[in-house]
């Protein structure tokens, strides 16, 4: 299977690419320069012949959220997804599936356990970003199966949030970040 991936150079994307190749799939990395160009012709050419597309693009959220960085968070997700969807929709033979990342920030921190369909949408910048991001992905051609994945914090010994979280523990210090009543949604890289 030929799988196109945005964000293939990021933490999740690089591991996913290696795993897919290990299982014999061909990975087509969709690099930033394809999204920086006017129009989507080159992007559509890169997608031609792909059976699946995985959208993991987006600036890291583990930075200080200045107004300028918030704009980068939005643009790196919304504009990339918009161009990706436009390119997929232009194909005569689009991929059978598009998997597009989102985040558990959609749900906020209302406490308690919720199912994905009955959880209330949060009233926050991150929730608004997730809604807009998912809305852009939802514009993909209806012949393409759309899967939205709301990731939590990614934990792995070799990257993601875990090494940063473990740093204070090396000095014998542990603490709860934020309100201890809030849930901590996480996913293991593997």
Located regions from the model:
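Conserved Rossmann-fold NAD(P)-dependent oxidoreductase catalytic core, especially the SDR/UDP-sugar
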Residues: 82-124
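Conserved beta-loop-beta element that borders a ligand/cofactor-binding pocket
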Residues: 102, 135-157
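NAD(P)H-binding glycine-rich loop region in Rossmannoid oxidoreductase-like domains
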Residues: 34-83
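Glycine-rich "substrate-gating" loop/helix at the edge of Rossmann-like oxidoreductase active sites
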Residues: 121-126, 150-159, 179-187
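A conserved pocket-lining segment of Rossmann-fold NAD(P)-dependent short-chain dehydrogenase/reductase
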Residues: 164-187
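Glycine-rich NAD(P)-binding loop of the Rossmann-fold in SDR/ketoreductase-type enzymes
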Residues: 72-80, 124-128, 132, 187
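N-terminal Rossmann NAD(P)H-binding glycine-rich loop of SDR-like oxidoreductase domains
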Residues: 3-22
